[in-house]
Amino acid sequence: QMCIRDSNFECLLHEKPFAGVNGSGKHDNWSLVTNTGKNLLSPGKTPYDNKQFLLFLSAVIAAVDDNAALLRMSASNPGNDHRLGANEAPPAIISIFLGEQLEDIVEQILQNGTATHSNKGERMDIGVHTIPPIKKDATDRNRTSPFAFTGNKFEFRMVASSMSIAGANTVLNATVADVLQSM
């Protein structure tokens, strides 16, 4: 009340989008870490040979694939449903983006039963001779995938700004645990 009286501000308890204003959402950075601090989704220097990482990566992929509707529901409300697919938001369908390096490893495993190498990140030469080529990030930087691997975690980009991430995390934790139990 003091803020309104003193500054002539008003408070809207509604998330965007509004006409002419992009939507609001949040990015839920999700990973699996042991009680000793080991990140189970850390690819390491040789992700193609990191069996523990590949096991947990495949469990997450299977969980999201098998339970896409549940995951979608965990991020759903009327304002957010209006935002998704427009207003600088990811599409309203669940898909996973792994990045070029991990996609190549998964393709090798699917075709050959094993992976023997991984593509190294490319280097960008920006054309300035005093600046050396910069290592290009091999993960998703364009923000168009609702569920993207970003280095050592997944980023779930569908959750509404007005929602807690607890629902989405509960779905992720339970469905990944279910897949791991069945392996």
Positions of the model-derived regions?
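Short, small-residue-biased leader/transition segments that mark boundaries at the very start
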Residues: 2-4
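Beta-rich nucleic-acid/ligand-interaction surfaces
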Residues: 14-31, 79-85
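Glycine-/small-residue-rich beta-strand-loop submotif within the FAD-binding core of flavoenzymes
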Residues: 35-40
